[in-house]
Amino acid sequence: MRSLIVLFGLKFKRAALAEVSSELRRIIMALGYVAPVPHAHLPFVRHPESDYVLEEEWLFEGITETYIPLLRVLEGLKRDGIDFKMTMSMTPPLVSMLRDPLLQERYDQHLAKLEELVDKELKHNEHYGHIRYLAQHYVSEFQQIRETWERCDRDLVGAFKQFLDSNNLEIITCCATHGYLPLMKMYPQAVWAQIQVACEHYEQNFGRPPKGIWLPECAYYEGLERMLADAGLRYFLMDGHGVLYARPRPRFGTYAPIFTETGVAAFGRDHESSQQVWSSEVGYPGDPLYREFYKDLGWEAEYDYIKPYIIPNGQRKNTGIKYHKITGSGGGLSDKELYDPYWAREKAAEHAGNFVYNRERQIEHLAETIQPPPIVVSPYDAELFGHWWYEGPWFIDYVFRKSWHDQKTYEMTHLVDYLRKHPTQKVCKPSQSSWGYKGFHEYWLNEANAWIYPHLHKATERMMELGTREPADDLEWKALNQAARELLLAQSSDWAFIMCTGTMVPYAVRRTRSHLMRFNQLYEDIKQDKIDSGWLEKVENIDNIFPNINYRVYRPL
């Protein structure tokens, strides 16, 4: 009888030892872990009352430039036998919009216009060799987008869920409408509603409770972990200084999670790996060979030619068709040279190799002093990959492929898998923090947006009052639930953020005011027992997020 070798409790025939999978060898030899975490989020923008609203195109651009390209990357990895592991957050507003039939239909029409435009560009530039080459590139790209969109039957959430079911993708949640929790902490019921509604929404869409949560803007305040524990969540993500300034100071910095006193773990962002990808100045996205974001056909083409593809009122807008590269830091947009996707893809592969090399050296250095094995957590906005950084999906693809084939120093992992493998960590109290400007709350509370908070606080107090009511009939039940929706939508951190950045400010102001006005109207109607059923039905149709919400989530804790 052939001799046997026993390895981790598994028996292998000696003759078959050479057939031990590359993944098992990787696990045996890995010194540490790397965990990229893209955060997929957009504010809830849906306007059935209008035929066209520019801000709905935030979603359409995200689908075309980020979500479908990322999905295609995952499909390619799986098809090629790469057993990838990645954690990704998908926020309730984004999931709701991706599954909304109206927005799906409008995206289909949006994609059809893009397909029409690039076909037109192909003919228009038949005598301009390189421009025609780029037009053909976009024709092929949109054909792939269309093929994926139709193959998924328009259900991108379901397509990503397949990778959740296969244990390749760990999808985590975020708060209900991306509300900025530290500025709600004086109203625990409001914080609880943001968390609990999100967890219920996740379970309705993914068929299981979430294990982790991306705190909106990675913003944490002391004691928040108690509500996370009550919601059944096992971990959350923070910016690095939230872990580094914890008490007592964690011995391993951000390279191991810390446990809060409730048992909920906190993972801190690694500065080095984040900077290499985030920064347009010292990071990869600013390379001269990459596509220039700010030079778009919508602004460059002759007006009469491009008019059918811009805003119906005649204003120009970005189309997503861009023919130029970053080129260099010295000149203006008029000095940009023509883009070449072939060389840009080559550069993305080179940068992916550099990223993998740096993570190897980082893990090797950390493993000399850290036990258990270190983990490098790299959170990013998902929309960076594809929308802002056109070559980002190529970069992610190459990082996973090179990590699988070209190194054995680290293992790509889910965050929850790391906790399973290494369940003993230091207990600390995390520090108040965010990943915003200067690391705290300044971007969401300043002279540009401070005016919204007295109104939000008053509405919160009123909603807590409504939370104790028992509805007299079905109409009041609907009104109470709609009031909860309006408050949640008004609390979105995106509106305060946009007001601070100075872009699309009128829309952010209008959205904040409209949700507060609808909430206050509902409050008065409920209190006076004068609910307008026709108006309520109209509002329910416009702001239809969280169809299964229960207003009682605002009752005293």
Where are these regions (language model features)?
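Acidic (Asp/Glu)-rich catalytic clusters
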Residues: 75-81, 155-172, 367-368
